[in-house]
Amino acid sequence: FSDMYFFFGGMVPAILESGIKCNLSRGLTVFDDSDYTDLPAYRDNVRLRGEWNGANNGRLIGDLCIHGEYTSNPKIVEAVAQHARETGARIQIHLSETQTEHEECKGRHGLTPAAYMEKHGIFDSPTTAAHCVWLEDEDFDILKRHGVTVACCPASNLKLASGYANVPKMLESGINV
């Protein structure tokens, strides 16, 4: 499973004991002009990767994370992308989860969330994008071109009444789901 949240420390012992395969990350949100290396999520993910990355015969992987476009800024997105390139880390993000998120990103940046993440280098590293409910045609091409893996979250999407991912089109496009 993949998880990005705030309290991974309590999860690690259970993950190790169960032997389950897991990509784990401390969620990153920022609403100001903070430097990436000053954020608690940066420190937590560096610690996670330093202490646990590759544990259980490689079954526990420490990823980097950007919660989403609307909970970050270009400076942070680019810093996470650079950190991933420098360390070989994978990245987890939420992408086009709701119509509001998707349309507001287009209003702010003139780009869909997928195009925005591509522009800022996130997809230069192996990436798992959660949700992907409101993708546009160009977004399928972006995800395929960069080998992005989509993690569908139907229970979450139903809870938010945000719709459901077009998995058949993803598969037809050659996207790993």
What residues fall within each predicted segment?
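Metal-coordinating catalytic core of metallo-dependent amide/deamination hydrolases
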Residues: 5-133
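Active-site-adjacent C-terminal substructures of enzyme catalytic domains
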Residues: 122-177
